[in-house]
Curated annotation (Swiss-Prot):
Domain of life of the native organism: Bacteria
Keywords: Aminoacyl-tRNA synthetase, ATP-binding, Cytoplasm, Ligase, Magnesium, Metal-binding, Nucleotide-binding, Protein biosynthesis, RNA-binding, tRNA-binding
Protein name, entry field: Phenylalanine--tRNA ligase beta subunit
Amino-acid positions noted as binding Mg(2+) in the UniProt annotation, renumbered to this chain: D497, D503, E506, E507
NCBIfam families found in the cross-reference section: pheT_bact
Length: 869
């Protein structure tokens, strides 16, 4: 995230004297730039400027040569000899660039360097070293550790260097005593990855006077050669994108300008080097440092090429299959046809040589070296999606790609190149060309039709229409109209995130202050349904019922992979074909979305069991994703534009079905040991009871249908699982998990589970209110009925027959006995029910109850049931 230096910020906006980093953080957070951290210096003094009086080389037995030096550190810090006179400090230094007559940075005893490295007098190589001459890396100023810092070569002007005195505070000189503010920015506000952008936001927060540096730079930039009749361009540039992503060109502006007769030996000025280092970038060379500095200051990534190595035209194109590129970091990359490249044309072969991966990183060929005298400056505007994909594909999160993928100002290229050219001319004696080439295909910004009333409707803020206009103008928008409360607003070139009225409302709310939004309860709509939908109410009832049953709700990630498929006995390859695959999965070993909840819920149960909790009763409500391989392809739509109704319908048609499911897993003991009885392990009946409770709570008339063993899915026990049916509608499974699944997951034996398709289950309900029956005051008639039936007849089937025959006089029915044996015959079983009859209008006589009994017996005979004596 960006590091903010108050001294640099002052270049673009007025800040009060004595502004602290803590106050700066408070000011910026008001406009949405959050404080990540205020970084204090890792270095403490004393650290001073030293003058090397002498440096005597002393070869050592190990082949190394050290220098025994005497360094003048000023009267305050020099040593005192036996006579009480101040004399230079004796210091051992092994750096190869140490020599007499140089001014260096001396860390004195008591100083602490990064990594908690404490400086103390120590005896080494036969001398007492009373301090240390420091390198950039030792002070945390960069990566250079090839030698100590020689202030003569550290970017000071001749006059500044001569003014440096021994004993002068080097902490302040090198800004080692200054903190930095690191801020966190949102992906849609890429312009704040620059001091230009942060200064603008500080202005919005405090009202401080702000000057946009790009305005003056654009005015000074020369007209492109195309606008100067008869003037040749610096170098020909062609944009040839034959594979745009989502129809958006990978490059819509490429600005090229030449700087000739550049001095490759010129040093980066100290102020620029210091700012780059404090921003977290190392100083490389003047040419490279200038492009990096312009990027940090204005927000425009740039690239510098050695012009003498290039042959025009420069061609911006997509990569071809099989092409490779070795980038500046020395790594070779296999290119994708989606990658956008910068190429030149050696020997007339147009676009045949790759110079770099556009907007991400340059290649080895064409880079600026210590011999470069003529430079081609590139400032371009690249598509956000193209750059983001290339950076992630090749794992190159460069500073340039971070900015391009968030959106760069389409009007900034001439200003950035002008600034870079001026700096190279001033510090490198280069001669900027006056004939730049500007290939500009950027689309014209569209006006947004904006109603002032949207601010109150969306954000709840009462903002005066004139203030709305002022705010939009202040952020850079062009505002027209307003007489009738409606504006035509054109977003500035640096705000690609402003596309719709809601974006403008967000900006107004941000700058008025989120703390100014009144706290109000949204009013319920006057017309239509109010509150939860019927299905939402049913979902809550299901959750409440399972919680009352003693189960605990869980929420798992909906991601699955090969291990989950194998644990549940699924064929991984067959399951993948009908599963939704995630393009950029959170977990590499779980790249698919679940088709059932049980596999993901099982991972939560596993985690509990591994931590010693075996008695688990968890349930989860959530979506599953049922991919249809024959579904139409989802169309690719351009960004920044609201899709049409037809496009939305095409998107919807290609989406997978996403029904609501509820699933539960019960393991271990259903009942603990106690005074009422012994331990009872979980079995299929506990899962069935949970399903029955769900059905009873929402008023669903479910039936359990036990299929043949061969028809039971692989994850269920073939003899202890049943389909959950509502009439002819299949709504799920309930029973024990297959022993193989329990073993694979590490579950106790006989672990039970259920999974219901709530979308299908809710669809079977009429939605009509349940009519409560009045409580009858007449006495009940209780009878026990035992029937002999075939083994294939289920208790549920016979119960439905009894309910139908008894009619309105049936108050309750309960199965209390199932019996098989010689007494009932082979292939038969006995089912006994306790039934209660009660009339709402009279006392049932013996004749009434006998008639009901006969009706039940007659109806039961239709399915082969015989009443036992």
């Amino acid at each position: 995230m960006p590091m903010i230096d108050i001294d640099w910020l002052k270049d673009h906006v007025e800040v009060p004297e004595g502004l602290t980093y803590e106050q700066l953080a408070k000011d910026l957070v008001k406009v949405g730039l959050e404080e990540e951290e205020i970084h204090s210096s890792q270095v403490t003094g004393p650290i001073v400027v030293g003058y090397v009086v002498d440096a005597t080389p002393e070869p050592q037995k190990n082949g190394k040569t050290i220098n025994w030096c005497h360094v003048d550190c000023g009267d305050e810090w020099n040593e005192t000899d036996e006579d009480g006179n101040k004399v230079p400090r004796g210091i051992i230094c092994g750096a190869p660039n140490m020599k007499a007559g140089e001014k260096v940075v001396v860390t004195l005893p008591g100083a602490v360097l990064p990594g908690d490295f404490k400086i103390e007098p120590r005896k080494t190589y036969g001398h007492i070293s009373n301090g240390m001459c420091a390198s950039e890396r030792e002070l945390g100023l960069g990566d250079n550790h090839n030698g100590i810092i020689l202030l003569r070569q550290y970017g000071f002007s001749e006059a500044e260097y001569e003014a440096l005195k021994p004993g002068q505070d080097a902490m302040h000189l090198l800004h080692l005593d200054q903190p930095l503010l690191e801020i966190n920015i949102t992906p849609d506000r890429g312009y704040t990855l620059s001091y230009r952008g942060v200064a603008r936001e500080y202005h919005h927060s405090t009202g401080a006077a702000y000057t946009d540096p790009a305005v003056a730079l654009n005015e000074k930039a020369p007209e492109p050669a195309d606008y100067q009749p008869g003037t040749p361009v610096d170098i020909d540039v062609e944009i040839d994108d034959n594979n745009p992503i989502h129809g958006v060109p990978g490059c819509d502006r490429y600005y090229a300008r030449i700087v000739k007769d550049f001095n490759p030996n010129a040093h980066t000025p100290n102020w620029m080097r210091r700012r780059l280092i404090r921003a977290g970038m190392r100083s490389i060379s003047l040419a490279v440092d200038v492009t990096n500095y312009v990027m940090l200051d204005l927000g425009q990534p740039m690239h510098a090429y050695d012009l003498d190595k290039l042959e025009g035209p420069i061609v911006v194109r997509r990569a071809n299959e099989g092409e490779k590129l070795t980038t500046l970091d020395g790594k070779e990359h296999d290119l994708s046809v989606e990658d956008l490249l910068i190429t030149d044309s050696p020997n007339g072969e147009r676009g045949s040589r790759i110079l770099g991966l556009a907007g991400v990183m340059g290649g080895l060929y064409g880079e600026v070296t210590a011999d470069t005298k003529n430079i081609l400056l590139e400032a371009a505007h690249f598509d956000q999606v193209t750059i983001a994909r290339s950076a992630r594909r090749h794992k190159i999160p460069s500073e340039a790609s971070r900015r391009f993928e968030r959106g760069v100002d389409t009007a900034l290229q001439p200003a950035a190149t002008q600034m870079a050219a001026e700096l190279m001319a001033k510090y490198g004696n280069g001669e900027p060309s006056e004939h730049p080439n500007d290939v500009n295909n950027t689309p014209r910004a569209k006006a947004i039709h904006f109603k002032a009333s949207e601010v109150a409707r969306v954000a709840g803020l009462d903002v005066d229409i004139n203030r709305i206009s002022d705010i939009l103008t202040d952020i850079g928008c062009t505002v027209a109209g307003g007489g009738n409360g409606e504006f035509a607003v054109t977003a500035p070139s640096w705000r690609p995130d402003l596309n719709e009225p809601c974006d403008l409302v967000e900006e107004i709310a941000r700058l008025v202050g989120y703390d100014q939004i009144p706290i109000t309860v949204p009013p319920a709509p006057v017309e239509g349904l109010v509150g939860l939908t019927p299905d939402q109410q049913r979902r809550r009832r299901v959750a409440d019922e399972l919680a009352e049953f003693g189960m605990v709700e869980s929420l798992s990630y909906p991601f699955v992979g090969d291990d989950d498929y194998k644990a549940f006995g699924f064929d991984p390859e067959a399951t993948k074909k009908v599963s939704v695959e995630i393009a950029n999965p959170l977990y590499g070993d779980r790249p698919y979305l679940r088709r059932e909840i049980l596999p993901t819920l099982a991972t939560t149960v596993q985690r509990n069991i591994r931590r010693g909790i075996e008695n688990v009763s968890l349930y989860e409500l959530g979506h599953v994703y049922l991919w249809d391989p024959n579904a139409p392809a989802i169309p690719a739509l351009p960004g920044g534009v609201r899709p049409t109704d037809e496009q939305l319908a095409a998107l919807d048609a290609g989406l997978p079905e996403q029904p609501d499911h509820v699933a539960g897993i019960l393991t271990g003991l259903a009942e603990d040991d106690g005074w009422m009885g012994g331990k009872r392990p979980v079995d299929w009946s506990d899962a069935v009871e949970a399903v029955r409770r769900i059905a009873g709570r929402i008023g669903a008339a479910i039936e359990l249908d036990q299929p043949a063993a061969d028809d039971v899915p692989v994850q269920w026990h073939p003899g202890r699982a049943a389909r959950v049916m509502v009439g002819d509608v299949f709504t799920g499974w309930v029973g024990e998990l297959h022993p193989r699944v329990n073993e694979a997951l590490g579950f106790p034996a006989h672990s039970a589970a259920f999974e219901l398709n709530l979308t299908a289950l809710f669809a079977t309900l009429t939605g009509k209110p349940v009519q409560a029956k009045p409580i009858s005051t007449f006495p009940p008639v209780k009878q026990d009925l035992a029937f002999t039936v075939d083994e294939t007849v289920t208790a549920g089937q016979l119960e439905n027959v009894i309910r139908k025959a008894a009619g309105a006089n049936l108050e309750s029915i309960e199965l209390f006995d199932v019996f098989t044996g010689e007494q009932v015959g082979e292939g038969k079983k006995s089912l006994a029910y306790a039934v209660v009859f009660r009339s709402p209008s009279k006392t049932l006589s013996a004749e009434d109850s006998d008639a009901i009994r006969k009706a039940i017996v007659a109806e039961a005979a239709e399915i082969g049931a015989q009443l036992r004596a």
